[in-house]
Swiss-Prot record:
One of its GO terms (molecular function) is proton-transporting ATP synthase activity, rotational mechanism. One of its GO terms (cellular component) is proton-transporting ATP synthase complex. It holds the Pfam family OSCP. Belongs to the ATPase delta chain family. Its main location: membrane. Signal peptide: none annotated. The gene is atpH. F-type ATPases have 2 components, F(1) - the catalytic core - and F(0) - the membrane proton channel. F(1) has five subunits: alpha(3), beta(3), gamma(1), delta(1), epsilon(1). CF(0) has four main subunits: a(1), b(1), b'(1) and c(10-14). The alpha and beta chains form an alternating ring which encloses part of the gamma chain. F(1) is attached to F(0) by a central stalk formed by the gamma and epsilon chains, while a peripheral stalk is formed by the delta, b and b' chains. It is found in: Cellular thylakoid membrane. It is a peripheral membrane protein. It comes from the Bacteria. Transmembrane segments: none annotated. This is ATP synthase subunit delta. InterPro entries: ATP_synth_OSCP/delta_N_sf, ATPase_OSCP/dsu.
Length: 180
């Protein structure tokens, strides 16, 4: 990943600098998350943008057609620039790096919580408080995922720290202790 970061970081930093100067950082963060979600939910779009067969002008037309009404002009121009520079194929990596740099600069930790079922707002609040204490940060961005194989409970990860409070893990531990 360090090689990819050496390509993505300058673009991500440039986008962050432009939106910071225009006082659009928070708005851009929301739009980047929506754009990433849209691209990740549409594998065909990602393949199309990454295709070496399509001409740059065709990719730019596709970008304009799909995104001109959905994102602000700064982000649209950024996507067209990436197409011009033959970097649109790694747009998701660049946008992910943009969010990483934003979180680093804003002292926001990213936590992923996987649970067997959808968490309620109260549960998310309690888990967020626990993770903030463990991570030693004041701000936390919580990403939730659902994995029914956990049976119950949750698995949370922040950086290299993992909290496994899942029922599946407890059953596995019980099975190991009984087999001894």
């Amino acid at each position: 990943m360090p090689l990819l970061n050496s390509v993505t970081t300058p673009y991500a930093e440039a986008l962050l600098q432009v939106v910071s100067e225009n006082d659009q950082t928070e708005e851009m963060v929301k739009e980047v998350k929506q754009l990433l979600s849209l691209i990740n939910d549409s594998p065909d779009l990602e393949k199309t943008l990454s295709s070496p067969v399509l001409e740059t002008d065709t990719k730019k037309k596709i970008i304009i057609e799909i995104f001109s009404e959905k994102i602000n002009s700064s982000l649209l121009n950024f996507l067209k620039l990436l197409a011009d520079r033959q970097r649109i194929g790694i747009v998701t990596s660049i946008l992910d790096r943009f969010l990483e740099i934003y979180r680093e600069n804003s002292n926001i930790a990213l936590a992923t919580v996987t649970s067997a079922v959808e968490l309620t707002d109260d549960q998310k609040g309690l888990i967020t408080k626990k993770i903030i204490n463990i991570a030693g940060t004041e701000k936390l961005e919580l990403v939730t995922k659902i994995d029914p194989s956990l049976i119950g409970g949750f698995v949370a990860s922040v950086g290299s720290k993992v909290i496994d409070a899942s029922l599946a893990s407890q059953i596995r531990k019980l099975g190991l202790s009984l087999s001894k």
